[in-house]
Amino acid sequence: GSRWFAAHPAPVPLAGIRANLNLDTVGRLGSGPVRIIATGTASEWPHVFRGVGFTTGIAIQNIEGAGQSSDQQAFIERGIPGVQLFAGASLDYHKPTDTPDKIDAAGMVKVATVAKEAIEYLAARPEPLNATISAAAAAPAQPPPGTPRERRASLGIVPDFAYTARGVRADSIVPGSPAAHAALQAGDVLLTVAGQPVDDMQAYSNVLK
């Protein structure tokens, strides 16, 4: 959907879109910070969200990379600075067990407050953000040739999306999963899976397809 919109922008042309704020996985904040993913796409982003945190008193964690984690990537690929507001994944991530009764409403108010403050700043700013999008960040994610689009396997780790070093760090482990049977623990970092290198989340996703 986001890539289609970016390819067929209406009623506003791409030249009129200064930034993208994407709210994705914001229902389980708990006591954690509001994570801002892909702040490396504009030089102002880290300062904007530090200011929002100071003004609102809401804990915020700026994460420079991981732009390909969600729909902001469709805009980043076209040179538009984009970020994702993220509350953190849970063991119910992408499962039918992610039911409405588990939503942290107070946490969502915090996320909405952060979004509101950032949007008001952008609306009042007379000039565009200074995009700092690298060629690697702007490149569309491409699975290896012959890789089916559907995910065929699950290891059973909930990734730590705030982790930006090499590999994929487990935030938590799904009980009874292959990862649990292999004695993986929260905090462990995957560097290879089935003999294939796993340098980042995109590589990990491709291995499981």
Language-model segment annotations:
Residues R3, H47-G51, Q73, A106-E120, ...:
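Solvent-exposed, polar/charged alpha-helical surfaces in well-ordered, non-transmembrane soluble domains
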Residues D24, G88, P96, D160-A162, ...:
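Generic beta-structure capping elements
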Residues S2, G32, Q61, Q84, ...:
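Extended hydrophobic-aromatic, low-complexity segments
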Residues P81-L85, T97-V109, V193, D200-A203, ...:
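Short, structured secondary-structure boundary patches
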Residues P9, T25, V52-G57, F86, ...:
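Sec/Tat-exported extracytoplasmic proteins
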Residues S2-S90, D104, M108:
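Metal-dependent peptidase/peptidase-like ectodomains
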Residues L129-K209:
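C-terminal recognition in membrane/secretory proteostasis and scaffolding
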Residues L91-A138:
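His/Asp/Glu-rich mid-to-C-terminal helical/loop segments that flank catalytic regions of hydrolases
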